[in-house]
């Protein structure tokens, strides 16, 4: 196993691992990195040496692969993924991968899974799962919050093409809406440059203004808002909380939880919003329970920072009915085996699973195969712009072609 420092889509250093087998097969995997991260995520190890890439270099994580991990994995069978991941867990010995770094363990774990597939002469998704479906994309089209330099508080406004017959159709519906949104923004003399995840980041002041623009773009595309294409939000409320437990979601001023819930109710009745991710902060369990109880029958309530792909936190959320869906980011937990365990736990509880990229992503397309292999209903991997996002869509199109008529779109 070899580690090296490479770069993500923001130009920040990140970790790549390359696994070599004795049959001559090798494969690489790269860890992504988030901007709005949950406090309970597995630890991303950076050197913190201000003289090297302003503290962002990952030489320690790379050295952990080359000096600590590599020797422990000698003579392992690459098909024994859970054994390999267990060795990584024991070697690290902490709750959240503080010693080795989740960026080191994940890169090794995923590179091994790719080697196993190559050895078995199978596509990665076929090596990971037995039954398959193609996920419906949640495509980011307007950015705010930590992903943009505008006044929008909600971090992501996304579209989901619910009436798509196949994956190419899903992409086409999103493409048409994006092109129409671009024309609308241009007609209003607004900027159409894109944010970290490929969505537009125009200087819009209110959530409602963004939602109106998206509805108009859907209608201009001869599609029905709420039927053909629905709107999904990622509020990233962790970033919008003050010390009194109030949130600045509606505007710059802060409001208590009950007012925020009423605001969400108003938005979901006025606009075709079918999914809200991180509507409240990661420790505000009561607020989560309230919102799920209030709108959860018609709206997907998605835990990202709440669950951080962690089985203990998901277990609490299932018991307390805090949400009805989970965002799955392998780098929040740090190994493939633990990621698969979380997906399986969520499915048993009838939670929807949404496989997700990070805002600092790379050309690695592992999550596309993961979404298909786990029959996850949705994938969240940015807009139809920037190669690190489009790479995932292109991979899903190849998978759709490989499976042919045997595969259907997942059911929401």
Give the residues covered by each predicted segment.
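Short, Gly/Pro- and small/polar-rich lid/capping loops
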Residues: 1-15
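Glycine/serine-rich anion-binding loops at beta->alpha junctions
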Residues: 7-10, 93-110, 137-149, 194
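Active-site-proximal beta-alpha loop/turn segments in soluble metabolic enzymes
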Residues: 156-167, 191-207, 236-250
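Metal- or metallocofactor-binding catalytic centers and their adjacent structured scaffolds
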Residues: 32-118, 122, 126, 171, ...
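Short beta-strand elements
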Residues: 15-23, 27-33, 139-161, 233-240, ...
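Mobile "lid/hinge" segments at catalytic clefts and subdomain interfaces of large enzymes
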Residues: 132-195
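Catalytic core of soluble alpha/beta enzymes
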Residues: 208-412
């Amino acid at each position: 196993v070899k580690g090296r420092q490479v770069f993500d889509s923001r130009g920040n250093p990140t970790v790549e691992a390359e696994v070599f087998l004795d049959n001559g097969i090798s494969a690489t995997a790269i860890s992504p990195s988030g901007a709005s991260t949950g406090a309970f995520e597995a630890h991303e190890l950076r050197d913190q040496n201000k003289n090297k890439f302003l503290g962002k270099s990952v030489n320690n994580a790379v050295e952990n692969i080359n000096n600590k991990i590599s020797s422990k994995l000698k003579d392992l069978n690459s098909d024994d993924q859970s054994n390999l991941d267990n060795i990584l867990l024991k070697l690290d010995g902490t709750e959240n991968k503080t010693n080795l770094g989740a960026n080191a363990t994940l890169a090794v774990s995923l590179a091994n899974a790719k080697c196993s597939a190559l050895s078995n002469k199978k596509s990665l998704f076929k090596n990971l799962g037995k039954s398959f479906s193609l996920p419906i994309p949640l495509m980011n089209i307007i950015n705010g919050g930590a992903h943009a330099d505008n006044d929008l508080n909600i971090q992501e406004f996304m579209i989901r093409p619910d009436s798509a017959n196949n994956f190419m159709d899903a992409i086409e519906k999103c493409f048409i809406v994006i092109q129409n949104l671009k024309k609308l923004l241009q007609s209003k003399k607004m900027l159409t440059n894109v944010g970290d995840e490929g969505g537009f980041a125009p200087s819009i002041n209110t959530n409602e203004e963004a939602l109106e623009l998206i509805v108009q773009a859907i209608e201009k595309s001869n599609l029905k808002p709420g039927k053909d294409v629905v709107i999904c939000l990622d509020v990233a409320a962790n970033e919008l909380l003050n010390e009194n437990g109030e949130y600045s979601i509606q505007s710059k001023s802060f409001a208590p939880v009950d007012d925020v819930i009423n605001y969400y109710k108003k938005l979901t009745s006025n606009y075709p919003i079918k999914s809200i991710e991180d509507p409240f902060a990661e420790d505000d369990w009561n607020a989560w329970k309230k919102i799920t109880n209030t709108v959860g029958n018609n709206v997907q309530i998605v835990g990202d920072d709440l669950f951080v792909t962690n089985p203990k936190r998901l277990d609490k959320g299932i018991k307390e009915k805090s949400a009805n869906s989970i965002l799955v980011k392998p780098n929040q937990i740090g190994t493939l085996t633990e990621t698969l365990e979380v997906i399986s736990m969520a499915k048993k509880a009838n939670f929807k699973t949404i496989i997700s990229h990070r805002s600092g992503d790379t050309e690695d397309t592992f999550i596309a195969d993961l979404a298909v292999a786990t029959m996850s209903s949705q994938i969240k991997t940015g807009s139809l712009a920037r190669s690190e996002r489009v790479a995932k869509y292109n991979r899903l199109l190849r998978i759709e072609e490989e499976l042919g008529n045997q595969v259907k779109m997942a059911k929401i």
